[in-house]
Amino acid sequence: MGQSVLRAVFFLVLGLLGHSHGGFPNTISIGGLFMRNTVQEHSAFRFAVQLYNTNQNTTEKPFHLNYHVDHLDSSNSFSVTNAFCSQFSRGVYAIFGFYDQMSMNTLTSFCGALHTSFVTPSFPTDADVQFVIQMRPALKGAILSLLGYYKWEKFVYLYDTERGFSILQAIMEAAVQNNWQVTARSVGNIKDIQEFRRIIEEMDRRQEKRYLIDCEVERINTILEQVVILGKHSRGYHYMLANLGFTDIVLERVMHGGANITGFQIVNNENPMVQQFIQRWVRLDEREFPEAKNAPLKYTSALTHDAILVIAEAFRYLRRQRVDVSRRGSAGDCLANPAVPWSQGIDIERALKMVQVQGMTGNIQFDTYGRRTNYTIDVYEMKVSGSRKAGYWNEYERFVPFSDQQISNDSSSSENRTIVVTTILESPYVMYKKNHEQLEGNERYEGYCVDLAYEIAKHVRIKYKLSIVGDGKYGARDPETKIWNGMVGELVYGRADIAVAPLTITLVREEVIDFSKPFMSLGISIMIKKPQKSKPGVFSFLDPLAYEIWMCIVFAYIGVSVVLFLVSRFSPYEWHLEDNNEEPRDPQSPPDPPNEFGIFNSLWFSLGAFMQQGCDISPRSLSGRIVGGVWWFFTLIIISSYTANLAAFLTVERMVSPIESAEDLAKQTEIAYGTLDSGSTKEFFRRSKIAVYEKMWSYMKSAEPSVFTKTTADGVARVRKSKGKFAFLLESTMNEYIEQRKPCDTMKVGGNLDSKGYGVATPKGSALRTPVNLAVLKLSEQGILDKLKNKWWYDKGECGAKDSGSKDKTSALSLSNVAGVFYILVGGLGLAMMVALIEFCYKSRAESKRMKLTKNTQNFKPAPATNTQNYATYREGYNVYGTESVKI
């Protein structure tokens, strides 16, 4: 009872102090209901009230605005009820606030039951509710108009369930009428960011390139962030953002990809009222007005400002009409059963709906259901060149594009602007000139790709500017973030128009950019440090034939000699028959042997034939001549083959390479090997399903220290410093070029691991794609591409032509090449002298014994038993230096 009395006294005093003599209050109390994520809107609400109260024009300010603010938790129905009742119990005349799908029904029910007007910038409701003034215009008509203008027949519709199903229903009805293919997905309840990514990837597999995103700004930013990460913002994609705050959305990263982005804007930044408000807004104290100074003005904050204008204008109208809006009765009890509505609430609602003012969001009018009407929405378009106003939409004219800036999916004309050509510093493709510091623009560079870009620009008739890629990478997509780096990233994100560089054509790159026909064919190759030239051995003259062949020749020599000896013994035609009628010989001369091919003469004959010198004896029998003939044929083939290989082995210094192929690399552990950290070579091994390459990739990704290098120059330097313990895998063209550069200590080994090509790249859907492709084909047919390669690879080589050693001159033989021959000669001479000495000693001893025996025989003079005479025999068939009984 006491509390009721105190409450009555309070309102009586408030009525006496707050009302003028005409019954209209001097102070209008309004309520404010804000959620946690409406910090800037709260600041805009208080600042708009402050602007009104500080207006010096008393005609415009016949009363003072006062506000009471409550914060509500929309997920808690008790919190929503308590917040509304708190406002109602304070005797507010109208409530400004926000709602979502969970709190909307509660708030609108209270407003309808208690006749309390609720002015909101939240999304428009589908139902026809009373006492709800909707500051935000509906987008349904504008969206349908643009879908028809762009002639979208297949697209994805991502919508937030909190915003209602009116747009979804309208789109589905239009899809049935126009035979559209619409894939609708609700994203309102998604909390996991990865789920957005999965949806986009699924749509991309369906070849979807057009998206209509109907969400609040925060959720749109989240979705677009995933679009950028997945690289789905390149040319060819089109995103329509069903939101009234196009300039509130973070589009910097998206615009660089080249995708076309269309959106709606309710705040006209060229409006003097907007400009004046922003000038004051940015000067506010951040501590008193959070998110005012250092944050851009949201369109919901502009709607909040306009809501205060509407409330103020409505009460001005009521004051002019002398409408009594005083609070009476049980106005402070919102939970009374039955509910007791405020009798003056209908007058206030009617006044609010009758308001027509110009605000920051344009013309503000309402229909009988409190919805915005007769409004204009600007249509914006974002491309690589930036955002621009493409047209406008209203209820009467529908979408009206600006005639001088017709909307198009094509890139802007390249004839009247300078094309940005991204490239990479890589010899011999692009290099700084020695005096580049004194030069400017494209004149600072030289190389194969510099000349190629000049030729292409000449054929396409464009002006261009060479731009070195900032991170020094060719282009790969990060497995985690899905962001492209290098030159591919420059094209994908719209920072360049063409890439003229040693950029390999691959499948993953072709998905996000376009390539011309290859201007150079190549493959992955192995670079190693050139091994030291092997010094020839003393017996290097034996190298033309394997040691197994030499052993076989020795055995063949011995075998032929033995066979010749045996054949000569068995054949009667090799024996000399004795003739007793012949004239008597000189007793002092030895007789001819009956067979010339004893074992030693057979060996001598075979050796003479093998050395192609011959001897003074030859076989007389047919069998012996057959043996000699096949031996001569054998020696002819062997000596000819030996002579043919001898020149190559003695004049060419061989280098023994420890690695000859990728298989050799994979099955050893002493020599490390790696690739460029970001490029097609690394991607080739990562994606390969061949066992050898899978094994190599497994080693490379787990090797410590890392075998991946940031640049090709780093990889080459590592090869040169590793003393043969590191192999670098790179494109064959680069490998061949470096092999021709000083200090000439690297070499390519083995064949190419794959076959691919370099191409000129352009963004997806670029208008330059076809002209550039035709230019490359024309340069190839004219032979200019071959001339450029010869110019930069071989004409400017520093190590001589690759085959110059065999074609231009023959290396002079050194002593080490033929030292073994001299050793054999010296050894043979020494052996001959030693044998001669032995023969001399043996003969001297034999002669001494013979002379002594002869002397003794002469002293005794025994009668000879037979007619015989002793002769020393030197001929084959007798004991050397022995005596034989020869008949006289």
UniProtKB/Swiss-Prot annotation:
The keyword Transmembrane helix applies. The lineage of its organism: Eukaryota, Metazoa, Chordata, Craniata, Vertebrata. This is Glutamate receptor 3. A lipid is attached at residues 615, 841 (S-palmitoyl cysteine). The chain crosses the membrane at residues 547-567, 622-642, 818-838. The keyword Cell membrane applies. GO terms for biological process: long-term synaptic potentiation; protein heterotetramerization; protein homotetramerization. It comes from Mus musculus (Mouse). It is a multi-pass membrane protein. The gene is Gria3.
